[in-house]
C-alpha cells in the first residue's frame, strides 16, 4: 500500500470540510505539517515513504549497492584492499601448518626429557625398584651422589694405600695419648715425662717446650 497516496487523499478530504486559507506548503503531498523546516527535508521524506516497488532498481531495499557487494565478495570478510584471494589462502595454509607443527615439537621435547631422567635414575644406587622418583627428587639425589663420589676420590688421593692410612691413624692416636699424659703431669706439678728419643731441653717450664720454641722462632 502506498503511504504517499493514502496520506494525500486523507489530507484533501480533511480540508474540504474545514475551509482554510490556501497555503502553498499545505498542498505538498509529502509533508506531515505546515512547518517550513520540513521543506528542506523533502528529499529524505521521499526516500523514506517510497514503497519497495517504487524504489530505484539499482539499490534494492535493505542491501548495499551491487558494486560494494561485489567488492566484499571478492575480498572476503578479513581481506584488505590489495590482497587477492589466492594470497589469503596461501597465508592461511602456512599458519595452519605452523600451528600443527607446534604440538609435535613439544611432544618430542617432552619425550627426550623423560628418557634423560630415566637414564639418570638408573645411575643412582640403592634406590628401591618400587620407588617412583619425581624429576626434582632425581636431580637432588644425583647431586648428592656426585658429591659423595667426589669426597671418596679426595680421600683416596690423600690416603693413598689403605693399609698405610690405618697405620698413620694409630700413630696419631698414640701421639695424642702421650701428649695428654704430659699435659696432665705438668698440671699436677710433676716434670713432664720424656718420650722415646726425646732429650730434656733447658729453658722455661710450665708450658710445653714446643710451644716456647714456636714463640721464639716468631
UniProtKB/Swiss-Prot annotation:
Membrane-spanning intervals of the chain: none
Q: Which Gene3D superfamilies match?
A: Helix-loop-helix DNA-binding domain
List where Low complexity composition bias occurs. 68-92
Biased segments, Basic residues type: 8-21, 95-107
Residue(s) carrying Phosphoserine: 112
Which portions of this protein are annotated as coiled-coil regions?
none
The bHLH domain covers which part of the protein? Answer: 97-149
- What are the record keywords, sorted? Activator, Developmental protein, DNA-binding, Nucleus, Phosphoprotein, Transcription, Transcription regulation
Q: Cross-referenced SUPFAM superfamilies, in alphabetical order?
A: HLH, helix-loop-helix DNA-binding domain (SSF47459)
- Tell me, what is an example of a GO biological process annotation in this record? cardiac right ventricle formation
**Pfam families to which the protein is assigned, alphabetical:** HLH
* GO molecular function annotations of the record: bHLH transcription factor binding; DNA-binding transcription activator activity, RNA polymerase II-specific; DNA-binding transcription factor activity, RNA polymerase II-specific; DNA-binding transcription repressor activity, RNA polymerase II-specific; enzyme binding; protein homodimerization activity; RNA polymerase II cis-regulatory region sequence-specific DNA binding; RNA polymerase II transcription regulatory region sequence-specific DNA binding
- PTM per UniProt? Phosphorylation by PLK4 disrupts the interaction with MDFIC and leads to translocation into the nucleoplasm, allowing dimerization and transcription factor activity.
Start and end residues of each stretch annotated as Disordered: 1-23, 56-112, 172-203
Residues with the modification Phosphothreonine, per the entry, are: 110
Fetch the InterPro entries from UniProt. bHLH_dom, E-box_TF_Regulators, HLH_DNA-bd_sf
Localization per record? Nucleus, Nucleoplasm; Nucleus, Nucleolus
Superkingdom field:
Eukaryota
Q: Name one GO cellular component term.
A: RNA polymerase II transcription regulator complex
* Function noted in UniProt: Transcription factor that plays an essential role in both trophoblast giant cell differentiation and in cardiac morphogenesis. Binds the DNA sequence 5'-NRTCTG-3' (non-canonical E-box). Acts as a transcriptional repressor of SOX15. In the adult, could be required for ongoing expression of cardiac-specific genes.
Subunit structure of this chain's protein:
Efficient DNA binding requires dimerization with another bHLH protein. Forms homodimers and heterodimers with TCF3 gene products E12 and E47, HAND2 and HEY1, HEY2 and HEYL (hairy-related transcription factors). Interacts with MDFIC. Interacts with SOX15; the interaction enhances HAND1-induced differentiation of trophoblast giant cells.
Protein name, per record: Heart- and neural crest derivatives-expressed protein 1
Q: Which organism is it from?
A: Bos taurus (Bovine)
Instruction: Cite the source lineage.
Output: Eukaryota, Metazoa, Chordata, Craniata, Vertebrata
What gene is this protein a product of?
A: HAND1
Amino acid at each position: 500500500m502506498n503511504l504517499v497516496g493514502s496520506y494525500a487523499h486523507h489530507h484533501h478530504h480533511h480540508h474540504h470540510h474545514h475551509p482554510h486559507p490556501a497555503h502553498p506548503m499545505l498542498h505538498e503531498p509529502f509533508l506531515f505539517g505546515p512547518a517550513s523546516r520540513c521543506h528542506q527535508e523533502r528529499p529524505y521524506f521521499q526516500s523514506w515513504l517510497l514503497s519497495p516497488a517504487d524504489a530505484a532498481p539499482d539499490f534494492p531495499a535493505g542491501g548495499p549497492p551491487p558494486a560494494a557487494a561485489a567488492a566484499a565478495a571478492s575480498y572476503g570478510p578479513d581481506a584488505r584492499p590489495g590482497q587477492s584471494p589466492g594470497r589469503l589462502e596461501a597465508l592461511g595454509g602456512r599458519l595452519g601448518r605452523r600451528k600443527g607443527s607446534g604440538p609435535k615439537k613439544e611432544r618430542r621435547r617432552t619425550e627426550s626429557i623423560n628418557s634423560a631422567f630415566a637414564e639418570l635414575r638408573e645411575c643412582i644406587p640403592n634406590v628401591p625398584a618400587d620407588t617412583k622418583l619425581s624429576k626434582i627428587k632425581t636431580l637432588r639425589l644425583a647431586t648428592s651422589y656426585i658429591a659423595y663420589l667426589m669426597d671418596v676420590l679426595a680421600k683416596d688421593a690423600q690416603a693413598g694405600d689403605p693399609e698405610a692410612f690405618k697405620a698413620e691413624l694409630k700413630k696419631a692416636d698414640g701421639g695424642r695419648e702421650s701428649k695428654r699424659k704430659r699435659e696432665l703431669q705438668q698440671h699436677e706439678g710433676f716434670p713432664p715425662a720424656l718420650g722415646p728419643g726425646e732429650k730434656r731441653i733447658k729453658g722455661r717450664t710450665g708450658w710445653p717446650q714446643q710451644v716456647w720454641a714456636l714463640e721464639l722462632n716468631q
